[in-house]
Amino acid sequence: MSQMNVEQFASELGVLPTVLLEQLQAAGVRKHMTEDSLTEKDKTQLLEYLRKIHGAKEEKGRISLPRRQTSEIKKADSTGKPRSIQVEVRKKRVFVKGVDLPVERKTAEIPAPAAPSVPPVRTPVIDAAQQALRQEEARRQAELIARQAAELREKRLRERPPVVEIKEPEEPAPPFVPAAPVAGPEAVPVAPETPSAAPGETVAAVEAEAAPSQPASTEGTLHKPAVKPEEKADKKKKPAKQVVWKEEKVEKRGLKTRGDLSGAKGGWRARKDKHGRTEEPAPHAFSAPTEPVVHEVLVPETISVGALAQKMSIKAAEVIKALMKMGNMVTINQMLDQETAMIVVEELGHVAKYAALDSPESFLADTEIAPSELKMEARAPVVTVMGHVDHGKTSLLDYIRRTRVASGEAGGITQHIGAYHVETERGMVTFLDTPGHEAFTAMRARGAKVTDLVILVVAADDGVMPQTVEAIHHAKAGKVPIVVAMTKIDKPEANPERIRQELVTQEVVPEDWGGETMFVEVSAKTGQGIDDLLESVLLQAEVLELKAPKDAPAKGIVIESRLDKGRGPVATMLVQSGTLKRGDILLAGAAYGRVRAMLDESGKQVEQAGPSIPVEIQGLSEVPVAGESVVALTDERKAREIALFRQGKFRDVKLAKQQAAKLENVFEQRGEVKVLSLIIKADVQGSYEALTHALQQLSTDEVKVNIIHSGVGAITESDINLALASKAVVIGFNSRADAVARKLINSAGVDVRYYSIIYEAVDEIKAALSGMMAPERKENITGLLEIREVFRISKVGAVAGCLVQEGFVRRGSLVRVIRNGQVIHTGELDSLKRFKDDVKEVRAGFECGLSLKNFNDIQVGDQLETYEIQVIARTL
């Protein structure tokens, strides 16, 4: 290898040449110029110096064994749910080569021989070359042992060496020559001019101290001398080398008993190690608690019995036992509601706390933009048209659409869309058609103010009807202003003043009379007052100052939804704020999906929709519920997570309420309470509400009326299928079944009853419930007989000759045998004869012969009492 100078070596190390010169001089290398050459010995000397000043140690003859141990623990999070945590324990053990053992020996005390004294040896059998080679090897081994002894002594002064179990070598270790041997500062020098016999004696002396059982090596022989028997015995006493992990040592002591406070010793004397020190127990040793442990249990909205037991660190059987004492029959996987779970926790002596709702829906609140940060713009009013049937509501809407929608779009309007918008000279108006008011009721129940105005349609020739009053109640409950449209004003029998008077009784006062409600007279046939109606709506909207942000994520509500055979789930959505674009990710209740197609009320494709614009969207995962709120998100994965969470939450809450088998429902579960299931369809909402209320009043402790479904309209195929599944009776009040439903009724044999008078329906249902009730049984005594004679006949048995004292006796009558005033038998007559003829009946004052079925213990003087059971039907 070519030598390099100081400057080249400094550039290779990345340091300044002047700094390298200072380090070389401090290490004892005499170099003064950057052009001076460096040898391998100089580099090694510099390396040893740097190791010494930095505290580095040579790692010779060491083996490091890393060890990893993975385990899994379960810990409850902030919501109370158990979470699995992976725990990894890393350990490292270092083993030193056995030649490093004699650390207590002081190499400096090894006496140097004054004169070579060669012990007597056998006659050499090898040549001189081999003998010289063997002596050279022994000399190298002596130098190595001396050097290692010095290094170990130096290390012992620096730090305490680790304690390891090492087997002492039985024979000298093979020669180990380092790559660049450097003598330590305290190493014993070995003179090169020592006579050839001295190295052998030095090796023998060192080995005699380190391992006395090993005899001195004999020079000039090819075989090892025999070991003496006593030396073999000494070797057997020494244990073999073992690699032992401290963490795996098992303490074989007495079992720790409950209540023992002796520091986990269990009353046994601790074992001592080879140095006389008492071994301490493992820090993770289990000690049984001496008093009950009270846990703080976080209870979520719903939790299973097994999970609740795990939180309290008890068995699930204990929780089930506590619930059974409270009257709940549950299983280990059954869901409990929060209130029940907290009562159980308190009953078992733990502390129950409401768990923080770990709901993905919190993501919606975090991502919601504050209204103050958004730019608010004016939006069109949303108007709902309400009114009684046949009051001209449909005609009014058709006239507005026909005159205010472009002629090219008039034929393309899809009638099933329940919302559309109209352009006027003063702005746009969005109309919301909610037949039956079902969607409006669902929206108001969810607290969503969808409608800004209500147009109340009242026929001028008919007056205020029940559904009109119902519409007024809906509007007042939602705190929505009303504009009254009096239709059919062109008819001769129209009477607007009567309409005003009737509406005043419902607290709807016109402006002419000092109120706040605008009244407009319109005619859907001639078009009279249509412009005034739209003008009134827009004027009322200006007073309300309707505003909504446009440049924001879309929010809205589901108006209608259905399942289309060709397009899948389809929902009509009203955008309330923001802008809905094609491709946005929507979340509607438990449904989610990407907007794949968006249509307006004309059936045309649109790319975006602003506030107060109704659109029909496709691409949701399922059919959403009418009245559900819709929000646009940016992350489809988060939308799916929230939707699945809502589905699971709804299912868990439903199961927790349904599965709880209370003790008070035991009789009903055993079938002792009979249930009559009904499906009611009526022409108007008021009719089925009144009929439902009247029928539910018929329920008693023995029979119960269960209204499975009630609605407005004709009896459909779905109603018949529901009746088949639930074994219910279908009642049509001023309503008939359609053609498809009639075919299913005839084929399946479903009981369908039609009524037009509410009292007829109530009377028939009452009669049906009376037939389901258990009848009343009444006992009537028919006759009294006295036994005058008893005849014993071998084939027949005992036959009694009797006299009828009162009433009459019939064949097959029920009879009691009375002896000394006590009833000894209750049974039935087997035969009845007068003289030798069988008779059906014997009246008072006549004698007869009779025998009892399965009873022969009759005596003279006994009395027979005949009776019959009368069944009386019960009524409500």
Swiss-Prot record:
Q: Give an example GO cellular component term for this record.
A: cytosol
The cysteines joined by S-S bonds are none
For molecular function, the Gene Ontology terms on record are: GTP binding; GTPase activity; guanosine tetraphosphate binding; translation initiation factor activity
> Which keywords does the record carry?
Cytoplasm, GTP-binding, Initiation factor, Nucleotide-binding, Protein biosynthesis
Chief localisation class: cytoplasm
Q: Where is the tr-type G domain?
A: 378-547
* Superkingdom of this protein's organism: Bacteria
Composition bias (Low complexity) maps to 179-219
- Identify the stretch(es) annotated as G4: 487-490
Give the Basic and acidic residues compositional bias ranges. 244-259
Which protein, by its recorded name, is this? Translation initiation factor IF-2
Q: Which species is this UniProt entry from?
A: Nitrosospira multiformis (strain ATCC 25196 / NCIMB 11849 / C 71)
